[in-house]
Amino acid sequence: MTPLAIRGRIFVVGVPRSGTTLLQGLLATHSTTTSFTESHFFARHFSRLPGTSTAILTRNPAPGVAAFLNENGEEPVDASRWFSSENRPWLRLKPWLPTQSRTVARRLLRIFDELALRRGTPYWIEKTPRHLRYVPYLERVSNEDPRPQFIHMIRDGMEVVASLYRASQSWERPYDLETCIQRWNEDVAFSLTRVADPNDHFVFYEQLTSQPEPTLRRLLADLGLAWEPEILESYGPTTDRLVTEDEPWKADVGRPIRHSATSHRELNAAQRNRVTRLLRQDLYHEIASRAQQRAGGIAAPG
């Protein structure tokens, strides 16, 4: 019997509150995939170098690795044991960290590989929205088969801003409205730069919630995975396992798929006017148009 090998490394990225958890849960219900709670491995431990596709290690990831394993109910794997203070005392020496950036990044990816193999699946899905800006770096450090695939979740800006603004009020550092607008503008502008890359795929929240089966069929085909109708029936419990008790704003993600548009309730008229004025909604239409062209003319969201 041929040993099980990793055939797919899949990252779901995008602006928070764009539907990334919904998509993650759907994909993780496939019989050949597994997924985890948000790792934050790169966003919390690496710093991007402005104007480059490079990032450097700036924080010891060992505590984050241990917390991630505990959150997912997993015992250590070989790749995670590598981070122990006995094996790598230099991880506690901040000046040394940047020199080991590539080595550590690859070891972190290997943790996902080994967990997936332990679970008996050849594909894994990692979903941390903030990893969007680390896509170029993840490409660089993953210079081996299988090449990583990146799924960008795109949602109407007004709805994202309203949802992000509301959800962040329970965070330690809530966002003001301008921060939410800036986050959407900058992140969607970044996703737009990736439209031509063959390893990047684009899913629109409006299409996923109104036409879940054809949208998922196309995405799975692009990822090299067969369609499984059970996904739409069984994704709820899978999604629930990917949400921690510290994420109450995700509590309803595993419910039946429906389009959610709540900006008219979450924001007052003055706030909606401010969002309309500052939001670069043209980015949404541009990325939808270019994704449609790349997909061979499949209708873009309205």
Regions found by a protein language model. Name each.
Residues 21-33:
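A conserved segment at the C-terminal end of the G1
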